[in-house]
Amino acid sequence: MVVTFLQDLEVLQDALLNNLQKLSAISRRKESGESKHDNKDSFAAIANEHNDEEEEIEFEDLVNIIESKVSDFESVLKCSIVEMTYKYPELKLQWEKSPRYDQCDKLHIVKLDKQMNEDIYAQLVEELDFVLQFVDWFYCYRLKVKEILRQHHKRDLAWNDEKRDRAIKFHAVDYDKLHQGTSSSSSLTSTSMEKASTREKLLSKTKQLTNNLVRGNQILQSGILQSDLNLDELRAQTNSLTQIDDKYTQFETVFKKTADLVKVLENASHQEKRDVYLSLGFLLCCVSWVLWRRIFKLPVKLGLWLLFKFFKGILVTLGLVKSYAGSSSSLQAPSLVLNAPILATTTTSSATSVEPFASVSAVSSIQRAVDEAVDRIVSHDEL
């Protein structure tokens, strides 16, 4: 891309040189024409004024073309400098254009990291050398153009003064011819002296007015040059503001994309957090279930059975509930499930102290109920 900009600079350089040669040729032709006009009479000078006007129009057109080409050259040169800065991140350049045409421009190397590849560094140095050559040539070109314009302006002022002096002399001769009489020599002498004094006064007044006009013209020319410089600065600032606006637009797009990405990450983070909480809750439920089945289930059931047995004993003592000793094995099974070891010890002692009417079948049924209760406890003691 930098090579493309350098090629564009070479094309603009050739065009500017051609226009400068044409401008110099017109300036030299006008200078030689003025020297020839000095040797001719006033009538011949008036006859050649038409050619001078055409050359002046051509000169102004060339000046306008050169100004547009200079602006294009400056823009392309700035683009090449910016492109070099983007192409080589280790390099940072800053072009300082001189506010005056007689002061050289400056190209500051703000940052340069020499710790890079040798081939890349050599290419960078070569392109930087080309850019420096174009910067120096651009300064010399502007200086040459300003010098030609200043000489042209001086020649125009001198030519205007010369035309004015010739016109004054021509009218003075006509005035002498018209008012020449046939009076005596003394009257002619006095009249010629009076005419000479009048002519001198007229010349002095005319020169004074001319000087004032020249001074005003110089002020206007300086104002025009200053306006041109201000316009150039405004164009440069406009280009800079346009580039800054483009960069801010790119930054805004990047910030919007970043904000969208942050929102997506936040939503994903909330979802992951919710999943983690659900996983922890499920883990706590599983641990609680294992603790209940392995540790807390039997003590809780035993405590409830003892509590119910205690209140049942109180109710039986108070006579509110009747005790049925001859209940079936199916009704005694829940109590035998909880205190199977106690029944195992009490059955041997009760076998000797049982009433005479207890039969062997009742004892066997109780043992079967105890065995079934123990088997039920063992079979249900799992997750």
Swiss-Prot record:
O-glycosylated, but not N-glycosylated. InterPro entries: Sec20, Sec20_C. GO terms for biological process: protein transport; retrograde vesicle-mediated transport, Golgi to endoplasmic reticulum; vesicle fusion with endoplasmic reticulum. GO terms for cellular component: cytoplasmic side of endoplasmic reticulum membrane; endoplasmic reticulum; Golgi to ER transport vesicle membrane; membrane; SNARE complex. A motif (Prevents secretion from ER) lies at residues 380-383. Residues 6-26 form a coiled coil. The keyword Transmembrane applies. The keyword Magnesium does not apply. It is a single-pass type IV membrane protein. The chain crosses the membrane at residues 276-292. Its main location: endoplasmic reticulum. Component of a SNARE complex consisting of UFE1, USE1, SEC20 and SEC22 or YKT6. Interacts with TIP20 through its cytoplasmic domain. Belongs to the SEC20 family. SNARE required for targeting and fusion of Golgi-derived retrograde transport vesicles with the ER. This is Protein transport protein SEC20. It comes from Saccharomyces cerevisiae (strain ATCC 204508 / S288c). The gene is SEC20.
